[in-house]
């Protein structure tokens, strides 16, 4: 019995690490793509063609049928439409981590949860300590966010000498950070709620539940119910991207039940397909039925949350996020009056809160939890590693810019906040790389000194 269970457990562990490796690889490469998009946006917004940059994102885009039309700017469809898919993937990541990952047990989740709370509370308090005007105080949440793609991307530049548990800790912290960001958006940056929209959203959610109950596995079947949920949340006055999180959390984490085991079905359909293909007078149309059933069995082999995340993640990482960066990172330097007291302090406060507040909050709360005996550091994770995670968490970039768009009404303050986010993200990345290289060299020197000659 034990001999049978061991290989199975080993295979499950290998699959889990393979998924994590693929996830980290996509995040690392997408961080470079995001950087290119942000630099392109800054250059474009400060070039002689700056007017075309603004004009492009204000281009109206209309959807509808007959007299029922809805028209908004391209910027709206990116920030409120495409970003819903990003938050859908975030919701699915949270769902998976709760089911079988770093958040699956209280013991595993306690330290990254506490560190994430510290990494949100300290930057927020640090920002407010600058004594802003009432309108600018709304930006307190801007420095609380972490851009997981950039943070993991910078960590990947340090190579495989960084222990895998450091990567897992950063990933868990960033996911909890995303949960807190979603709650902040829901409670602090959604307007007065119109409860009639909840009825529309509930109809969409009931449709999703109904499709899941009857075992519909095709993602296309959920597009219309998902759009209804998005519309309902938009009508309530809450930020419509929350629809993505809700739908992501509802995605099943277990494979759809089949009449026979998926692997047995794949074996049988493959045999049937080979038999028909080798027939002396076979018709190509004869292959369609076993091919269709084979694709269905392959699809049902994986849980929907794994399948959907694997499909959407590259599109989000290499499509939606770079487009978001291109549309939002283009700050015209001539349009931001940093000599004015308000915008100047907004930029400084955001930058200081991200660069100093993030590591201070993460390291201090982690130290306190360990000191009190409520948590222990994961294997191969030391205080230098926690400091590295804290520095990298100061890379707010896309998530911080997203919150800034919700927090600031004044264009000058918004531009200053974006400049603060961009400069802080760059500084945090450089500090993180420098600290990481120094830590690796120190660890290598200590190992060499302790080894027998």
Curated annotation (Swiss-Prot):
GO terms for biological process: regulation of pH. GO terms for molecular function: sodium:proton antiporter activity. Disulfide bonds: none annotated. Its main location: membrane. InterPro entries: Na/H_antiporter_dom_sf, NhaA. One of its GO terms (cellular component) is plasma membrane. It is found in: Cell inner membrane. It catalyses: Na(+)(in) + 2 H(+)(out) = Na(+)(out) + 2 H(+)(in). HAMAP family: NhaA. PANTHER family: NA(+)_H(+) ANTIPORTER NHAA, SODIUM ION/PROTON ANTIPORTER NHAA-RELATED. This is Na(+)/H(+) antiporter NhaA 2. It comes from Pseudomonas putida (strain ATCC 47054 / DSM 6125 / CFBP 8728 / NCIMB 11950 / KT2440). The gene is nhaA2.
């Amino acid at each position: 019995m034990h001999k049978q269970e061991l290989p199975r457990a080993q295979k499950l562990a290998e699959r889990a690490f393979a998924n994590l490796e693929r996830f980290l690889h996509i995040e690392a490469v997408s961080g470079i793509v995001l950087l290119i998009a942000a630099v392109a946006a800054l250059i474009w917004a400060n070039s002689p063609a700056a007017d075309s940059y603004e004009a492009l994102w204000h281009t109206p885009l209309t959807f509808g049928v007959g007299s029922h039309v809805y028209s908004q700017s391209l910027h709206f469809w990116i920030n409120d439409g495409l970003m819903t898919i990003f938050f859908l993937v975030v919701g699915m990541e949270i769902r998976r981590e709760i089911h079988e990952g770093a958040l699956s047990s209280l013991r595993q989740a306690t330290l990254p949860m506490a560190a994430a709370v510290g990494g949100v509370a300290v930057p927020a308090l640090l920002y407010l300590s600058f004594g802003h005007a009432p309108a600018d105080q709304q930006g307190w949440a801007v420095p609380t966010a972490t851009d997981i793609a950039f943070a993991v991307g910078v960590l990947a530049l340090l190579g495989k000498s960084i222990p895998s548990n450091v990567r897992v800790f950063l990933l868990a912290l960033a996911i909890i950070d995303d949960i807190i960001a979603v709650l902040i958006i829901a409670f602090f940056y959604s307007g007065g709620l119109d409860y009639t929209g909840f009825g529309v959203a509930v109809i969409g959610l009931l449709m999703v539940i109904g499709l899941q109950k009857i075992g519909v596995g095709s993602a296309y079947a959920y597009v219309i119910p998902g759009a209804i949920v998005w519309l309902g949340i938009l009508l309530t006055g809450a930020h419509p991207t929350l629809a993505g999180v809700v739908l992501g959390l509802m995605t099943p984490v277990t494979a759809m039940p089949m009449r026979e085991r998926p692997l047995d079905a794949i074996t049988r359909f493959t045999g049937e397909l080979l038999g028909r293909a080798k027939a002396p007078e076979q018709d190509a149309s004869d292959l369609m039925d076993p091919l269709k059933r084979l694709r269905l069995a392959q699809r049902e082999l994986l849980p929907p949350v794994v399948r959907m995340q694997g499909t959407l993640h590259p599109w989000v990482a290499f499509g939606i996020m770079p487009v978001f960066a291109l549309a939002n990172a283009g700050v015209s330097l001539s349009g931001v009056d940093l000599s004015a007291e308000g915008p100047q302090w907004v930029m400084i406060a955001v930058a200081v809160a991200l660069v100093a507040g993030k590591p201070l909050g993460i390291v201090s709360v982690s130290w306190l939890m360990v000191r009190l005996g409520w948590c222990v550091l994961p294997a191969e994770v030391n205080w230098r590693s926690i400091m590295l995670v804290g520095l990298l968490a100061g890379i707010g970039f896309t998530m911080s810019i997203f919150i800034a768009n919700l927090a600031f009404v004044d264009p000058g303050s918004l531009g200053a906040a974006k400049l603060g986010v961009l400069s802080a993200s760059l500084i945090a990345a450089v500090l993180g790389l420098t600290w990481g290289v120094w830590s690796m060299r120190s660890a290598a020197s200590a190992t060499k000194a302790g080894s027998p000659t």
